[in-house]
């Protein structure tokens, strides 16, 4: 007896094409290229979830460094003095303060310098 799987095949292909909706060119129309594009996009998404963490850390360090240099101290010296003075604050919060709450950031820098000296 011949097995006809037309409806199942259509469902499977429709599912892949739905995932590829919005892709450019044949990647959103053709089943094979759409499937390849979706799998590739998952690969990029997995890789870039890791990369995002590194990118944000770089951004925070750049912002802290710029604000610290306005206070006359380098990033590495500031972080060393913060660790020495047992100030429990992470880079994300320091960067946020450096951008949006400059006076509080200045107070932390002064406190770190005073405690470590």
UniProtKB/Swiss-Prot annotation:
The alphabetized UniProt keywords are: Ribonucleoprotein, Ribosomal protein, RNA-binding, rRNA-binding
This protein's GO CC annotations: ribonucleoprotein complex; ribosome
Q: Which residues form a coiled coil?
A: none
Kindly list the GO molecular function terms attached to this UniProt entry. rRNA binding; structural constituent of ribosome
SUPFAM superfamilies cross-referenced by the UniProt entry: Ribosomal protein L20
- What does this protein's UniProt record list under function? Binds directly to 23S ribosomal RNA and is necessary for the in vitro assembly process of the 50S ribosomal subunit. It is not involved in the protein synthesizing functions of that subunit.
Q: What is the protein name stated in its UniProt record?
A: Large ribosomal subunit protein bL20
Q: Which organism is it from?
A: Mesomycoplasma hyopneumoniae (strain 7448) (Mycoplasma hyopneumoniae)
What phylogenetic lineage does the species belong to? Bacteria, Bacillati, Mycoplasmatota, Mycoplasmoidales, Metamycoplasmataceae
């Amino acid at each position: 007896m011949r097995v006809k799987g037309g409806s199942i095949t259509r469902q499977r292909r429709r599912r892949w094409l739905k995932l590829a909706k919005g892709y450019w060119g044949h990647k959103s129309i053709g089943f094979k290229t759409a499937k390849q594009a979706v799998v590739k996009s998952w690969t990029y998404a997995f890789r870039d979830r890791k990369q995002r963490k590194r990118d944000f850390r770089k951004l925070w360090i750049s912002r802290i460094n710029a604000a610290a240099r306005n206070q006359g101290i380098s990033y590495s010296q500031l972080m060393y003095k913060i660790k020495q003075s047992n100030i429990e604050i992470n880079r994300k919060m320091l960067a946020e303060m450096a951008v949006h709450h400059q006076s509080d950031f200045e107070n932390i820098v002064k406190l770190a310098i005073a405690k470590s000296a």
